[in-house]
Amino acid sequence: MDSITNKRSLFESSHFWILLSLIAFIALPSKALDYGLLESTADEFLDAMGWSSVNLTILWFLPLIGFWLLPSLKLSTETQAKVELGLISFILLFAFISATIYKVSMGYSVIVLIATLTALATFAFAKLKMMQGDKFIIGALLSIILLIFFFIVYPTVAIFISMFYDGETFAPEQVVRILGQGYIVRVISNSLFLSGFVGIVSTVFGLAFALYTTRIAHRTAFIGKIFSILPIVTPPFVVGLGVTLMLGRSGYVTEFLDTYFGFKDHNWLYGFNGIAIAQILAFAPISFMILDGALKSIHPSIEEASYTLRANRYQTFYNIIFPLLRPALANSFLIVFIQSLADFSNPLVLGGSFDVIATQIYFYIAGSQLDYASASTLGSMLLIFSLLIFIVQYMWIGNRSYVTVSGKSYRGDVQDLPSGLKYTIIVMLGFWVVFNFALYGSIFYGSFTVNWGVDYTLTLNNYAMLFGQGLSDGAWPSLINTMIYAGIAAPLTALFGLLIAYIVVRKDFQGKKTLEFLTMLCFAVPGTVAGVSYILAFNDAPMYITGTGIIIIISMVMRDLPIGMRAAIAGLGQLDKSLDEASLSLKGSSLKTIWFIVFPLLKPALLSALVTSFVRAMTTVSAIVFLVTADTRVATAYILNRVEDGEYGVAIAYGSILIVVMMAIILFFDWIVGDTRIPKSQAKKAD
């Protein structure tokens, strides 16, 4: 215990942190290394050291000595804390502004400097009794603010600023010129029309299936769980490729229609039709999950009251249930609208001549003519549309209350749906199940064929090309990279999500709503825009981290941060605050309270967030497609390259492997989470 106390007191010493930064300045590069620590030459390493010559980086560390001199001024505790905060702000601003002006990319020692300044700011705020002087909470809050600023706010601002620059020249008129082009106007209108259509149809299908699982199904309700898992584990491009195998030029449905009905338009799929079909297949489950939860929260006693007043089933549904679902319906439409706007993979496979914003941004960056100005302008437009929708959803729908559950214990039974609606839903679900069965069957079968539409001979060549060339060739490097990056990103996502949730739910401070809003903003920023903004923000001074695995991990963490936060917020809402207060009253620190009280009780929710974050990190493409290199390529980028080269069989085979792997991971974690819950029999014995 004494050794632990001594270690803790060491970390709570400002002298320790200042000394650590000075040691880092001597031992680590203060300027960025183009080829990293392991591959840089001795001369490159020496040139990057801050002490190797008189340079700007010395001035970033020199003011730290001021913290050793402050006690000699014998200021009051409050005054000294304010002076320290002023000095910390000066060092941070001076370092980043000077690095930007003089094009100096920051090195590893600056990371230690930022950590030191965060620790010193924590001590200063503790002296001012912020958060009751709880250093752990203050430090966690400051770390989260820095994380959000550097990797959400800063890149978002960077993409807006860059659209007014033509290279190094300030050219605001180019925005009007780019947006005034007829082609760009058509791309924007295509995207908005497609997203609106997909949003409406996906919400209709989602409502139908939610009504089936909550009002019709008895033994077949498990279909809802399968329905909600499939889109999560399906990698990008795979749904689009599966639709192509069925309905494309050489698809078996197209050939059947041609043979028996004389259907000759074999290109009908490529364009709006194909993108809409693929997106509805991918996003209707999102609507289902939203509306399924909303329907389960409607108290059956309301329906019984309607029948008691002699209303028939049609009147009850359209006048009672449907109005209560309006917030969820609007929420579903807006979320699917954003997802459709941001979708990159399906338009790339099925778009044909129907161009949308997300793919056009990709072509501006990865195409033959590099055009950052047009990419950032279109990215800004896409971001503006997404942010407007997100703000409407967050501020309007989020603040509306349609409470139907009171404190009374009577539950009642849900009533039957109108017969016409019931049979319509059953027909819709039957069609959907058959279509999805054929779709995924085509995907798995297609991965074993020589050439779909030409030669259906079964073969293992596609899998041999992927995994039969050794660990250093084929798909192995991308799969290993993906597992490593996702394995690092998922725990960080859950950890930061827990910290943010604990601070937002359990602590009161100015700016709490802003912090929560900015964290949820990660969901609103389309993946393509996030990728472009990271290139613009981190491809030059002051922070140069493009081309590294670090930026990919950061992108994965920031994209999925709301998942961990929302899971922890939901769990904390079920834990009485008196548990925390009891721990703190026994002189337990906030860190011990979180680790020994909160974390064990939130384990099921956090494990679910962990596996969801892991799977999303495994399947992300639009946010990282611009960030990967030959050395950091991930699975989805490998699939994208195969699609671009026309190697559909190899791409489908890789997608099939990922589906199986991720389904196994989800089922494994579902089994673990099931074991972490207390069985009812044990709970009764404990009582």
Curated annotation (Swiss-Prot):
Species the sequence originates in: Actinobacillus pleuropneumoniae
This protein's GO CC annotations: plasma membrane
Entry protein name: Ferric transport system permease protein FbpB
Functional summary from the UniProt entry: Part of the ABC transporter complex FbpABC (TC 3.A.1.10.1) involved in Fe(3+) ions import. Probably responsible for the translocation of the substrate across the membrane.
Pfam families: BPD_transp_1
Presence of the UniProt keyword Glycoprotein in the record: no
Membrane topology listed for this record: Multi-pass membrane protein
Family: Belongs to the binding-protein-dependent transport system permease family. FbpB subfamily.
Limits of the ABC transmembrane type-1 domain: 188-393, 479-669
Cross-referenced CDD domains: TM_PBP2
Entry's transmembrane regions: 10-30, 50-70, 85-105, 106-126, 141-161, 192-212, 226-246, 271-291, 318-338, 347-367, 378-398, 425-445, 450-472, 484-504, 517-537, 538-558, 594-614, 620-640, 649-669
Gene that encodes the chain: fbpB
Subunit annotation: The complex is composed of two ATP-binding proteins (FbpC), two transmembrane proteins (FbpB) and a solute-binding protein (FbpA).
Localization per record: Cell inner membrane
Source taxon at top rank: Bacteria
UniProt KW keywords: Cell inner membrane, Cell membrane, Ion transport, Iron, Iron transport, Membrane, Repeat, Transmembrane, Transmembrane helix, Transport
UniProt key word Nucleotide-binding: no
Example of a GO biological process term: transmembrane transport
Main location: membrane
